[in-house]
Amino acid sequence: MTLDRLSHGPSRSHLTPLVAGLLLAGCGLALASSHREAPFITTAPKVDGTDFYMFRSYEPNRADYVTLIANYLPLQDAYGGPNYFALDPSALYEIHIDNNGDATEDISFQFRFENKLANNGAGVSLNIGGKQVGIPLIQSGTVANLKDGNLQVAETYSVSVVRGDRRTGNVQAVTSSSNGSAVFDKPVDNIGTKTIADYAGYAAKHIHSVNIPGCAMPARLFVGQRQDPFAVNLGTIFDLVNAPVGVITNPALINAAPNAIGDKNVTTLALEVHKSCLTNGDDVIGGWTTVSLRQARLLNPSPPAGYQTTEKPGGAWVQVSRLGMPLVNEVVIGLKDKDKFNASRPSGDSQFIDYVTHPTLPALLEIALALPGTAPTNFPRTDLVTTFLTGIKGVNQPRNVVGSEMLRLNTAIAAVPFALQNRLGIVGNILAGGNDNAGYPNGRRPKDDVVDISLVAVMGGLCMANGNADALGFGAACKPSAVPLGATAFKLHDAVDQAVVPLLPGFPYLNTPLPGSK
């Protein structure tokens, strides 16, 4: 997406006073995580991306690493057996990195999955009255180890790194640092405490040290089920923001409502890579995640015995899911274009420009809250264009940026230990006068409350900071008088506190998944 005012500037590891003023207002438009956000993706939950995170690792002794996390398969009930939540072996899951600001991937990490029955495809059988009969469950006993013999279904995956175009670039296998294998084991989902007594310990055995071709330092890799790390007042928001204005504008009530998805799990693809492997002469990188499916599929009306034998896919890869900033497609892109956005690449984002320059969400909030005349009046919304499409100059804008939607991270800004992180990222840090410049919108950490930050921006917080003298360069129309809410815009929240979500202090950072039974 392009506008005359899209700026080009060098990245910096510090915050100028001008930038501090901008960040005080908050950035983004997300009101909910990317769960079931587009019509087509509701039919294919295994390839539905829910959240994307990209941040400097804050685990001790990992300061020079960047963690990439892509979550898929939303709203998993922990008790969802007997098949649980294996990922799609017919899909291509990818994490893309743009390291020169041109809106095109320079590095892609590709994940492919394979799910096989034990005993060379024969599965597990029991002797029942002299006959060997296959069992109906994915496990035949307790599970504790890699390649556990009591698992009837073995879930494995491979990872490749592609340099250049995702389909025509140079493809090389990511391999285990310990044995050179290009195939990795995925832990079974958290069936329950009787089957897996120590799931945290079991899952930790599936954290792999890996070698990435072209990278001098080894990386870490984990794929498996986690507790959904996102906190949001989901049902209330989509029910026309069914909450009193006095609650969502009172900072003392930031945790007045329960987290609607606090009892759900997701499936995580996590990769921790040395920052030198991701950058290319600029400290700022952009990232996003996608999934593609084969263009055609045949369904066998008489599938043979085995595992997932009904479908036979073929043809070219077709992208069906896309997620960068949290979350554009859910509450910014119009319903008629949601599937189109999921199929698009950042280089083609000019087709969606009106959704950012003239967003409908503020007007919808006026209707939902019965507060006419509260939406900002500055058009085009150059404040939001900067946040979504270029990054913020002096923080996370690449030197030669082409306007496009993706999450952007300045890898030169140091990580902050978990206990010292501000849940409002850079916005909260400015308010507190602290030293945490490593959070959203400079990348995104699991603790960052992107919902609350985003509500501030969508209702005009950036223009409040821009002032009457166009201090931030958003144009003369972006000024306090264009923000009917005034200072109240800084108090908005969804009444669910991201900071209370349980998280781990180190890789893969997201909490142990909830068990199917206790």
Predicted regions and their residues:
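Short, functionally important structural connectors and interaction interfaces within domains
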Residues: 15-16, 258
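N-terminal secretory signal peptides that target proteins for export/translocation
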Residues: 1-13
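Surface-exposed extracytoplasmic segments
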Residues: 31-518
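Bacterial N-terminal signal peptides
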Residues: 16-27
